[in-house]
Swiss-Prot record:
This is Spindle assembly checkpoint component MAD1. It comes from Nakaseomyces delphensis (Yeast). It is found in: Nucleus. Keywords: Cell cycle, Cell division, Coiled coil, Mitosis, Nucleus. Residues 51-586 form a coiled coil. Central component of the spindle assembly checkpoint. One of its GO terms (cellular component) is kinetochore. The gene is MAD1. Belongs to the MAD1 family. GO terms for biological process: attachment of mitotic spindle microtubules to kinetochore; cell division; mitotic spindle assembly checkpoint signaling.
């Protein structure tokens, strides 16, 4: 109440009351300004993000639209190509018919031409069926692409409408922001007017400096924002350039692929033209060959047909088989003659060896005879000497007794008789040997002459006959070879004229076929799902529905197929895992058996990284090694007396666990009763 009546208190009316109120309003205004700026920036960022997303979607739809138009264009081009090919085939058929009508040939040749016409007609029918199928397929694809274009256009219009609505919202927000900025500027003017009433110049100077600093900061923030906007625009431009570059690169690749396909089609067309020319040349050569084989003198056989050629060829082939069999028989006979000649040569060599042995035995016997003759002469000389000695002895020992002389005479007579018997026996044996040698040599000569003459005569006769037959057969072989060359040339021409068929072998149940079948099935399901989803989107856009309560059946089928594929993959993985487990168990058992047989220990792996080791010499005793704690436990200390000493020596001091196990094995072997 004192404040209303104007009391004397100095704090009734504060000189800075209005300033505090202005500052409070200022803080509230700045807080509202920041809040509006934050909302504006958030909305602007959201608008930019949505704009970029809509631009991307618009670009994708435009790209899809261009791709659909390209596919339509390609389909039309291919339809034009098929129509042109059909027209060319019709023209070729008409030309073939005109040529067939102009060329009047034999009945068999007409039959062949008829078969060729039938083949051409079948080919034309097949091509027409293929043309109709391709045309129907391209028509359906064209309709699908039209539907897709319509859906894309509707989506583009929808997104353009959304863009317009968002741009209107942004414009309204901008107008509100401008109004708020105007209010803030008015408040700033009021605040500056009230700041002029401040008596403290130092505070005013500080406020001006702060205001300048804030202005510089605001200017710096604006510059940063502008640079960020420029960079964002540059980034957008670069992204659009990149997307356009990728699009044109893909377009270039598609064009290159089309050019490559056109080159391949042109090459195939040229190859077909060359094959047609080759067929025409072969037909003309065949006609010329038939005309040359015609016999104009004979009225009944004035035409030489292909059946006549086949008959002549079969006759020549049969003759060739007969002559080939005869030639094989002659080869066998010549081989038999060679074998007989070899046997006779072996017998001759054996006879020559026997002759040499007989001659050697004769020479040896003659040497023996000569030696016996020499011994005979020596014995006669000895007899003479003995007689002389006896006579001398007689003269010297007349006083000896007559009994001794008689004994000597008896001995001498016996010696003479024996020598005579020996000489007579030697003469008899010599005469027998000489006679036997003469008889054997004469008999062998006669036998040789008889057998050799007969064998030589027979061999000479056989050789002469075989040489004559061989010369005749060689002449026939040369003739047959010439005929065979001619027939082979004709067969080669006939084979070249025939239609060439290529068969490609393929496994019936190969993994590649399974994968391709699964991919094809998945692709068909995805295509059906895509079609149904497009139709569903069109229905939603036409009926202006906000949500979809149902899903298409194709989506369920595709998910079911993916689930089946995943189940099959799981089954395959389980089978592979079971096989790997079996292999691992088998290999681990082999490893344990090898360690047991080579090192004398059986290993048993336990939980928590422990290994139990059994010795083959004491199966009831064991060692437990903990690989995590590096500890060792055993019940072998009851058997081995110096267990602790060995453990401290080999494990604690030297750190050699293998040597420790080896010493334990030796100790257990020593303790094991044999």
């Amino acid at each position: 109440m004192d404040s209303d009546s104007g009391g004397s208190s100095p704090f009734v009316e504060s000189p800075h009351g209005e300033e505090v109120q202005v500052r409070g309003d200022e803080t509230n205004n700045t807080y509202g300004q920041d809040q509006w700026k934050f909302k504006y920036e958030g909305l602007l960022n959201e608008w930019e993000i949505q704009k970029i997303q809509w631009q991307k979607e618009k670009y994708e739809f435009e790209k899809r639209q261009l791709a659909a138009e390209d596919r339509l264009r390609n389909a039309n081009d291919e339809m034009d190509i098929l129509i042109q090919r059909n027209q060319d085939l019709v023209y070729r058929i008409e030309e073939e018919e005109r040529n067939r009508i102009n060329n009047d040939e034999g009945n068999d040749l007409k039959g062949g031409a008829g078969s060729m016409d039938k083949g051409k007609k079948q080919e034309i029918e097949e091509l027409s069926r293929r043309y109709e199928a391709d045309r129907f397929e391209w028509k359906t694809q064209n309709e699908e692409l039209d539907l897709e274009l319509k859906s894309c256009k509707s989506l583009i219009s929808k997104y353009e409408q959304l863009l317009m609505e968002q741009s209107e919202k942004i414009n309204s927000l901008r107008s509100e922001v401008k109004n708020k900025e105007d209010q803030i500027a008015e408040l700033e003017v009021v605040r500056q007017k009230k700041d002029h009433n401040i008596t403290n110049t130092e505070e005013f100077r500080n406020l001006t400096t702060l205001k300048d600093i804030i202005k510089t900061h605001d200017q710096y923030a604006l510059d940063l924002e502008q640079s960020n906007m420029r960079q964002a625009e540059e980034l957008k431009r670069l992204k659009s350039l990149k997307e356009s570059a990728t699009f044109w690169r893909s377009e270039n690749e598609q064009l290159q692929e089309r050019i490559r396909q056109l080159e391949e089609v042109e090459q195939q067309y040229n190859e077909v033209q060359l094959e047609i020319l080759e067929l025409k040349v072969n037909i003309s050569e065949w006609d010329r060959f038939l005309k040359e084989k015609c016999q104009p003198g004979d009225t009944e056989t004035a035409e030489y047909t292909p059946s006549d050629f086949v008959r002549d060829y079969e006759i020549l082939q049969n003759d060739y088989k007969v002559l080939n069999d005869e030639f094989e028989d002659l080869k066998k006979e010549t081989q038999m003659v060679k074998i007989l000649n070899d046997e006779l040569a072996m017998e001759r060599n054996q006879i020559l060896n026997l002759k040499n042995e007989y001659e050697k035995s004769i020479i040896n016997l003659e040497k023996l005879n000569y030696e016996l003759e020499q011994q005979k002469t020596l014995s006669f000389e000895e007899c003479k000497l003995l007689r002389k000695q006896l006579e001398s002895i007689k003269h010297k020992s007349n006083h000896e007794e007559n009994d001794s002389t008689k004994d000597y005479e008896v001995l001498i007579d016996n010696y003479k008789n024996q020598t005579k018997d020996l000489t007579s026996e030697l003469k008899r044996m010599n005469d027998e040997l000489i006679g036997s040698n003469r008889d054997s040599s004469a008999g062998s000569k006669k036998r040789k002459l008889r057998t050799g003459d007969s064998v030589n005569v027979n061999l000479a006769q056989k050789l002469n006959t075989m040489q004559i037959e061989n010369s005749n057969l060689q002449k026939e072989i040369h003739k047959l070879k010439a005929i065979i060359d001619v027939l082979e040339k004709k067969i080669r021409l006939l084979k070249e004229n025939k239609e060439k068929r290529i068969r490609i072998l393929q496994q019936r149940d190969s993994p590649l076929l399974k994968i391709q079948f699964a991919r094809k099935q998945e692709l068909d399901l995805l295509k059906d799902e895509n079609k149904e989803l497009l139709s569903l989107i069109e229905n939603v856009t036409e009926n202006n529905q906000n949500r979809i309560d149902t899903i298409p059946l194709s989506a369920y089928k595709s998910l079911e197929f993916q689930y089946q594929q995943s189940q099959e993959n799981v089954v395959k993985g389980e089978k592979q895992l079971s096989r790997l487990k079996q292999i691992y168990n088998k290999k681990s058992l082999e490893f344990i058996d090898i360690v047991n047989s080579m090192l004398g220990f059986r290993l048993e792996f336990m939980l928590d990284g422990r290994v139990k080791i059994y010795s083959c010499y004491k199966p009831d005793k064991y060692l437990i090694a903990n690989l995590i704690d590096n500890t060792l436990k055993s019940n072998l200390d009851a058997i081995i007396s110096d267990w602790d000493e060995l453990l401290s020596l080999w494990v604690v001091e030297r750190g050699q666990l293998p040597c420790f196990l080896a010493t334990i094995t030796l100790r257990l072997w020593e303790l094991n009763p044999i």
